[in-house]
Structure formats: structure tokens, C-alpha cells
Regions:
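Glycine-rich flexible loops
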Residues: 1-179
Length: 179
């Protein structure tokens, strides 16, 4: 991995070693990662991985106030393709702008992860948790594909219809999804 960092926290819980093939320094968001992991451990969560990245299309949505309202972006993204609801059934939490690398951002992330597995940091990026890094990444990837479909339709000059609420409810029942 050339542009990602994988670390192992040492037994003293105060230091770490980089275990990836390429020695890439950890993200400046390490405080958020560690705070979230501590929270997950304290709750005996099955989630062991977190991913923070900067998907362009999802970040672009945060520059539109309507998508910062609770579950507006979630419902729009779910409606673009069925896979989005199936791969990201808890939706996309939204965290209003906080200073990057701040304790406030870490605390807001922990709070929002009570209801969502993926959270959007306004005008910054996305943070996801799951059982492993690939599953966390897959959630981000499918959400970003939905954002790309939405933006492509808008660029073609029309508002995409998306799946209806009835169709999304049918998926929830058929696949036994939480929301």
C-alpha cells in the first residue's frame, strides 16, 4: 500500500509501529481513529477497522445545505442504486464542520457512529467503521458511486428520479436491513 498507513498499537498503549510494506506516516486524523477504536472496544463492538478518506463526490454534496440535514443525503444516495442501501444499510451520518484533527471532531464522530457506520465530515471527508478495512471501504465506495450517479444526472440537466420510498422499503424487508 503506497498511500495508506497501517499501524499496530503497542502494549504500552502509548505508542505504535507502522506495519505496512511502505512506511507512510499516519493521518493527522489519528486522534479520531484512536478515539473511535477505544469507543468500539469499550462497547465490545465486532467492528475492528476504520477508514478515513476524501471521496470527491461525497464531499461535494456537503457544499449544498439541504444535504447537511439529517438523512437527506442518505435517502438520496440510497435511491440511486439498490446496492447502496444493501451495502450501507445504516446510512450516512453528517457531522457539521469541525476543525480537522480536533478533539471536537473525534467526539462528534463517536456520537454519530452510534446511529451510522459511515459519517461525512462537512467539507472534509468520510469516516467509516466495519469488521475489516475492506468492508468499511466498500461502504464508502458504494456511497460515492451513488453520489457520482446523482451528480452525473444533474450534469445531464435533470433531477434523477431514484428509487421510490416504496421500492426502498421493499429492499429493507427483502434483505432484512436495519433502516
Amino acid at each position: 500500500m503506497e498511500n495508506g498507513s497501517v499501524i499496530r498499537i503497542l502494549d504500552d498503549c502509548a505508542s505504535y509501529v507502522i506495519i505496512a510494506d511502505e512506511a507512510v506516516a499516519p493521518t493527522s486524523e489519528l486522534p479520531s481513529h484512536l478515539s473511535v477504536h477505544n469507543d468500539l472496544l469499550s462497547k465490545n463492538s465486532p467492528y475492528k477497522a476504520s477508514v478515513h478518506t476524501h471521496p470527491i463526490e461525497l464531499i461535494a454534496l456537503t457544499h449544498c445545505k439541504k444535504f447537511l440535514e439529517k438523512d437527506v443525503a442518505t435517502n438520496m444516495l440510497w435511491s440511486m442504486i439498490p446496492e447502496t442501501k444493501a451495502f450501507c444499510p445504516r446510512g450516512l451520518g453528517i457531522i457539521p464542520y469541525k476543525l480537522p484533527s480536533s478533539v471536537e471532531l473525534a467526539e462528534a464522530t463517536i456520537k454519530e457512529l452510534q446511529d451510522y457506520d459511515v459519517v461525512m465530515w462537512e467539507k472534509h471527508g468520510v469516516f467509516a467503521v466495519d469488521c475489516d478495512a475492506m468492508q468499511a471501504f466498500d461502504q464508502i465506495d458504494v456511497l460515492n458511486k451513488s453520489a457520482l450517479i446523482y451528480i452525473a444526472a444533474k450534469n445531464m440537466g435533470f433531477e434523477p428520479d431514484g428509487m421510490s420510498q416504496e421500492q426502498m422499503k421493499e429492499m429493507t424487508v427483502a434483505f432484512n436491513l436495519p433502516k
